[in-house]
């Protein structure tokens, strides 16, 4: 019984002490709030001050953002400059490499593609027919030239016909030896040479330019008309370089060029087809 009474007394003391502590803490909090409110009432802050403070904060934040942006831009510019420099270096090295390879490939062409593509040597029969056909063709022109043409102050035999003899009698199967190329090649080249002679030579123009222009234009015209015949370039040059008065104007186109080319064609038709292994022409036009 005594123990129970003791426990009751102790419990009542603890409860009374706890209630006292709670009331004291509540009073302390109230006093702190009142002091804070009194201090806040003493501070006089206007709306303008608040706005100015907000602006300062915003400007400070914007300044930091601008600084960050500037730093980022500078870094980006540096990176771009570095990338541009690297790209320029790559382009320069690539250009040097391309030039180097072009030079190497260019001089490799001087070495040729190999002896395996060289045409075989013709047999004795083919060589014999080439000699006979070329001898006959030039002989016919020479006879007409020295026996008939000179007496009439005409010319039938010129140097470019010797080059034509090599083609139409030496390689009669070549596209350059066919009748279209033989006739049109000489004819067009003679026209070009005559025009250049009249336009430049007889107007006291540059004679060197006239020679080069006659040959180059004749080659271009033959290629354009698919009638390329290498001796035609010589025909154009002879036309420009001739000093005989009878060559003045366009008479040179018909005599000796067109007439001589027809005589060469007739000789090729007769002699080439006598050969067992030859058939001329492959086509006419």
Curated annotation (Swiss-Prot):
Subcellular location: Membrane
Protein origin, superkingdom: Eukaryota
Region: Disordered, residue numbers: 1-25, 59-87
Membrane topology: Multi-pass membrane protein
GO cellular component: membrane
Main location: membrane
Keyword tags: Membrane, Transmembrane, Transmembrane helix
TM stretches of this protein: 124-144, 152-172, 182-202, 205-225, 250-270
Biased composition (Low complexity): 12-25, 65-85
InterPro entries: HPP
Protein name per Swiss-Prot or TrEMBL: Transmembrane protein DDB_G0269096
């Amino acid at each position: 019984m005594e123990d129970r009474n003791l426990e009751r007394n102790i419990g009542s003391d603890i409860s009374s002490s706890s209630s006292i502590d709670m009331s004291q803490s509540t009073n302390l909090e109230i006093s702190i709030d009142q002091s804070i409110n009194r201090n806040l009432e003493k501070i006089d802050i206007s709306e303008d001050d608040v706005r100015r403070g907000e602006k300062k904060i915003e400007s400070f934040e914007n300044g930091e953002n601008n600084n960050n942006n500037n730093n980022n831009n500078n870094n980006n510019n540096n990176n771009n400059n570095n990338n541009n420099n690297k790209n320029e270096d790559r382009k320069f090295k690539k250009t040097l490499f391309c030039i180097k390879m072009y030079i190497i490939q260019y001089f490799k062409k001087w070495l040729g593609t190999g002896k395996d593509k060289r045409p075989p040597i013709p047999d004795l029969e083919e060589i014999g027919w080439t000699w006979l056909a070329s001898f006959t063709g030039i002989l016919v022109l020479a006879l007409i030239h020295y026996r008939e043409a000179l007496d009439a102050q005409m010319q039938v035999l010129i140097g470019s016909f010797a080059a034509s003899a090599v083609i139409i009698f030496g390689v009669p199967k070549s596209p350059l030896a066919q009748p279209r190329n033989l006739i049109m090649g000489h004819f067009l080249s003679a026209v070009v040479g005559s025009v250049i002679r009249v336009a430049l030579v007889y107007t006291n123009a540059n004679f060197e330019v006239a020679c080069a222009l006659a040959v180059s234009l004749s080659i271009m015209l033959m290629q354009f008309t698919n009638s390329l015949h290498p001796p035609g370039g010589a025909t154009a040059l002879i036309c420009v370089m001739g000093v005989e008065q009878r060559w003045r104007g366009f008479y040179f186109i018909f005599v000796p060029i067109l007439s001589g080319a027809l005589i060469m064609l007739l000789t090729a038709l007769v002699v080439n087809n006598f050969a067992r292994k030859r058939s001329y022409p492959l086509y006419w036009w």
